[in-house]
Amino acid sequence: MPHDTEFELFRDSYRRFLKEQVAPYYEQWEHDGLIPRDLWLRLGENGFLCVDVPEEYGGYGAPVHYSLMLVQETAQAGFASLAVAIGGQSELVSPYLQNIGSEEQKHYWLPKMVTGEVVTAIAMTEANAGSDLQAIRTQAILENDHYRVNGSKTFISNGLHADLIVLVAKTDPQAKAKGISILLVDAALDGVKKGRSLQKIGLHAQDTAELFFDDVCVPATQRLGEEGQGFAYLMQELPRERLSISMMALGSILGAIVITKDYVLERKAFGQPLSQMQNTRFVLANAQIKAKAAQAFVDQCAALYQQHQLSVTQVAALKCFITDVQCEVIDQLLQLFGGYGYMQEYPISRFFVDARVQKIYGGTNEIMKEIVARELLGK
């Protein structure tokens, strides 16, 4: 990605924000299982949310790589829960509104997302519908000037804090892909209920929740795009999500290398620093080599995205490759810590548990391989 002086100044500013506003409190947030709501306002005040939103909708009109950098830097600092939260707002929901929303919707929601006044979540997954989105059961039936919504969603990132829910629902239960639409649901509407915070093996500070919709009346004006085109919109916007996940993976790899390097330079075994042992050197060299390859792949796809040329297959290959590398490299680096790597007080343990879900959300890596194979084999 291009790095000019303005970009570097923006990145340095964000690094200072992480050091001053996040690092001293992150352990407590992980313990509490929730990032505080006021952090969103501080992110907004400092210009770190939805930075690529055009100025006419309250944003800064920055290039996309500014926004992606924020996700990478957050993950690299070891704050993966926050990276997922920011990514959900800036890399998932914001592009949907920018690219599909009506002028009224964009003018109403986007400025509040930029300031952090509104936190957003996208609700696709259900208990019986993960990779197979066509199997969702949540229904939104049109009645005069509103949709009546009934159903439930699970594994929803930012679910507890969400003020706006981008809901994927069946508007035609008899149809398959063409029966899916997307609604903008104000979380304050009657019938919207937020369930428990789900307990995960990683990403402890990232609020992940169940959402329930009981006869929720959503104005028809809050449908996003055309009725029945929801599945097509999802396919259209998924590349940005997968690119964001890949940026997070890259950041995690780079961050894990740094803390491991620092550890092996200090730690001694058998009378010498771990850094002098061949296995240690080879593990770190292998991690660095794979990080360089991952960086090149990410940069290529990010450049293609900015040129509106990134294909579904290309970003599927990237997401699969780099998250596999992330999990593999961090596992090998943790081994260099010995028993200390298994202790929560050592940051490498958090990098390890936070990495595992990267191969699952945003489309499982098995689905990514199927996408690549379909293009390769022609079916």
What are these regions (language model features)?
Residues 1-80, 87, 100-105, 112-117, ...:
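Alpha-helical interface subdomain recognition
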Residues 86-87, 113, 128-131, 155-158, ...:
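Short Gly/Pro-enriched turn/cap motifs at secondary-structure boundaries
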Residues 91-100:
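Helix-loop "lid/cap" segments that line or gate small-molecule binding pockets
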Residues 135, 190-219:
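Flexible, small-/acidic-enriched active-site or ligand-binding loops
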